[in-house]
């Protein structure tokens, strides 16, 4: 078909048919040009950078337990004893026993609560001259108390004993002293020694005290530390001595401690200087 024939047929059509058939080919001219939905800045375009992609929505976290996955909630491990013992640098049990024993030893340690009589020689000599007997020195070692006693040589036959209580004079025991040969012959003084073991268990509320007595020619002479006795107290109580004043009641020949127990000495908690112990034991002269 030639172009002339097409043009002829188009011209022969009615005007209404021509507009209806080819109406879709006529479109209105837009008033404004369309803009792109994404625009790059001039800086990004110049540098060649690409705009970042849109961030995806975060996935919400979920918590799931082991039992939901078919697993156990607990894990049990069983340890069996080794066939060969471990080579430890020290024995833990022995170390703990040592710590406990040290703590117990500190709480049960005792100290002398009086000064050494022979430390003041002039006073010691005057006491010996007046009372004919006097404790010379004393020391505490390994749950035992040991010391020496000086007496005037009034006769050949003589007896020296330590009267000691471990329960605040509810009961007492007499321990004989042993004669010590004097270095210098012909002295008018004799020396006796004693060594007394302390009980394993002593109640904390009880007091240990002792006095010295000397029997000669049917007479008995006492050294009771001027009526106060020689006391042995626990180490932790040493710092608290002197807090209680001595008893100021009438002199009836007997006194009572703070628990109401009778004692053969006078006064309560007098102030005495402390003594840690002598390394050597022996006569003063």
Curated annotation (Swiss-Prot):
Gene3D superfamilies: Carbohydrate binding type-21 domain. GO terms for molecular function: [phosphorylase] phosphatase activity; glycogen binding; protein phosphatase 1 binding; protein phosphatase regulator activity. InterPro entries: CBM21_dom, CBM21_dom_sf, Pase-1_reg-su_3B/C/D_met, PP1_3B, PP1_regulatory_subunit_3. Residues 125-233 form the CBM21 domain. Signal peptide: none annotated. Keywords: Carbohydrate metabolism, Glycogen metabolism, Phosphoprotein. Highly expressed in the liver and, at lower levels, in skeletal muscle, including in vastus lateralis, gastrocnemius and soleus (at protein level). Highest mRNA levels are observed in skeletal muscle, and only moderate levels in liver and heart. Weak expression in placenta and lung. It comes from the Eukaryota. The keyword Phosphoprotein applies. GO terms for biological process: glycogen metabolic process; negative regulation of glycogen catabolic process; positive regulation of glycogen biosynthetic process; regulation of glycogen biosynthetic process. GO terms for cellular component: glycogen granule; protein phosphatase type 1 complex. Interacts with glycogen, PPP1CC catalytic subunit of PP1 and PYGL. Associates with glycogen particles. Forms complexes with debranching enzyme, glycogen phosphorylase, glycogen synthase and phosphorylase kinase which is necessary for its regulation of PP1 activity. Acts as a glycogen-targeting subunit for phosphatase PP1. Facilitates interaction of the PP1 with enzymes of the glycogen metabolism and regulates its activity. Suppresses the rate at which PP1 dephosphorylates (inactivates) glycogen phosphorylase and enhances the rate at which it activates glycogen synthase and therefore limits glycogen breakdown. Its activity is inhibited by PYGL, resulting in inhibition of the glycogen synthase and glycogen phosphorylase phosphatase activities of PP1. Dramatically increases basal and insulin-stimulated glycogen synthesis upon overexpression in hepatocytes. This is Protein phosphatase 1 regulatory subunit 3B. The gene is PPP1R3B.
